[in-house]
């Protein structure tokens, strides 16, 4: 007996298959064991990922930046790049001061299934904050202005690093002030940060060490 294939069934199977592929992406992220940066698919939609990066060195040290990764509808089968949007304005040549989006064109021109992965994006995010000067240089020369999202940040970084660091400091202070804000959306997978409470967290630490 052959089951009739209906358009609705085909779409459902396609979504299930996509879900498994995105779950595989998350497993690859875990296998990379990246330090200081975390990302997880939203509970409500696997095409939306929540992320946060903790920066401990360089001119962005002490900052905690939240971001979202929006995957294209046909991910990973279409060549359109994912979209990375930070929750706040961050002064950086590759981050748009209006939309807070990160330009991924310096990393990838198109998305290629089985060759490119979400952990590549996470490592790129780490790299642009660890070495902002290096992020605006490609093959020993400055990147074209068309590959930059914030010309003022590019100019200051190139000509006056002291002023650049002062502007970056504003981004750091804002991130520290708002890192414990309530989640903007109700999603159980949203990454929530809590203030350190000895009576609560010491018990958790002791429990984890005893296992």
From Swiss-Prot:
SUPFAM superfamilies: UBC-like. The lineage of its organism: Eukaryota, Metazoa, Ecdysozoa, Arthropoda, Hexapoda. Residues 17-177 form the UBC core domain. Belongs to the ubiquitin-conjugating enzyme family. FTS subfamily. Coiled coil: none annotated. InterPro entries: UBQ-conjugat_E2_core, UBQ-conjugating_enzyme/RWD. CDD domains: UEV_AKTIP. This is Protein crossbronx-like. Pfam families: UQ_con. Transmembrane segments: none annotated.
């Amino acid at each position: 007996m052959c089951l009739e294939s209906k358009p609705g069934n085909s779409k459902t199977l396609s979504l299930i298959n996509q879900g498994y592929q995105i779950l595989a992406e998350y497993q690859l992220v875990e296998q990379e064991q990246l330090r200081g940066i975390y990302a997880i698919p939203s509970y409500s939609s696997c095409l939306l990922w929540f992320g946060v990066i903790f920066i401990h060195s360089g001119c962005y040290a002490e900052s905690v930046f939240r971001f979202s990764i929006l995957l294209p509808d046909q991910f990973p089968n279409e060549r359109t790049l994912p979209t990375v949007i930070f929750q706040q304005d961050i002064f950086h040549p590759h981050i748009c001061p209006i939309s807070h989006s990160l330009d991924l064109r310096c990393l990838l021109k198109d998305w290629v299934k089985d060759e490119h992965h979400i952990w590549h994006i996470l490592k790129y995010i780490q790299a642009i904050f660890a070495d902002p000067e290096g992020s605006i240089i490609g093959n020993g020369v400055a990147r074209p202005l068309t590959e930059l999202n914030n010309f003022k940040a590019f100019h200051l970084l190139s000509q006056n690093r002291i002023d650049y660091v002062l502007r970056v400091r504003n981004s750091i202070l804002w991130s520290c002030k708002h890192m414990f804000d309530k989640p903007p959306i109700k999603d159980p997978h949203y990454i929530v940060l809590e203030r350190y409470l000895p009576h609560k967290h010491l018990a958790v630490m002791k429990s984890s060490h005893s296992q």
